[in-house]
């Protein structure tokens, strides 16, 4: 009897090995708007480094307040000086880069007093930054791709109502394109402030801030807390893509900066195995300009 070639176990072993080594490609998200020395939005997107840009911040809204956007030294919205940002938004979108308005931030005055208040804020965001036709659009007539929740202050209530209001089908049908929802929670799980919103499962991208929180950040050569926290977030939150949010330089945050060579050699090879891996988020464009961090990591992201 002829001997049957024993190739099947080898093929299975190779298949298992390939599965274990699967690595997903990602992109870099950047926050722009909080330093007048970081270049224009067009210049930011022309670098070719970024796949997502969050314009930061609409930091006053809700609870009956007149909403206000703060773009630091870039322009003065009080005199309609920020409408020219529309040119940059369109230039970025023409390059395939998604541009979101980030609401909240680490300083400001924002809260939601009720579900009706959340609906009113959603209407304002729609009419002034998304598909609506308000005559008072602070960033001009360009239509942004979505809204980023960077909720770091105040009450935990009604952020889920805001997410649902922004996601309602009538909004999206009206303009025939998707409204992206993104979020930047702090890494302690669950983040108590936007946690109710994240639990809706409506968010497309979640860029968790893995810094300024020692229990869940990189520290002194130790990646354990960081990677354990990453695994908890990616296994618990339903989103299209999970991003590792990092400071772009040691000056960008008090704690949690990861040297580029450590990120590319010890951390990215691990987190890129997750099917939910979306890439890396950096704070911010100004600090990235100073450090060249995105250039150092882009080919590995």
Swiss-Prot record:
A single Gene Ontology MF term assigned here is: endochitinase activity
Task: Supply the alphabetized keyword list.
Answer: Carbohydrate metabolism, Chitin degradation, Disulfide bond, Glycosidase, Hydrolase, Polysaccharide degradation, Signal
Keyword check for Translocase: no
Which EC number(s) does the record attach to this protein?
A: 3.2.1.14
Which residues are the active-site ones? 152 (proton donor)
Q: Which residues form the signal peptide?
A: 1-25
Which cysteines are cross-linked by disulfides? 45-92, 75-82, 187-216
Q: Which InterPro entries match?
A: Cts1-like, Glyco_hydro18_cat, Glyco_hydro_18_chit_AS, Glycoside_hydrolase_SF, Glycosyl_Hydrlase18_Chitinase
Catalysed reactions listed for this entry = Random endo-hydrolysis of N-acetyl-beta-D-glucosaminide (1->4)-beta-linkages in chitin and chitodextrins
**Limits of the GH18 domain:** 26-301
Name the PROSITE patterns on file: GH18_1, GH18_2
EC main class here is hydrolase
GO BP annotations listed: chitin catabolic process; polysaccharide catabolic process
Q: Which family does it belong to?
A: Belongs to the glycosyl hydrolase 18 family. Chitinase class II subfamily.
Q: What does this protein do?
A: Defense against chitin containing fungal pathogens.
Q: Which PANTHER family match?
A: ACIDIC ENDOCHITINASE (PTHR45708:SF21), ENDOCHITINASE (PTHR45708)
Name of this chain's protein: Acidic endochitinase
Q: What is the lineage of its organism?
A: Eukaryota, Viridiplantae, Streptophyta, Embryophyta, Tracheophyta
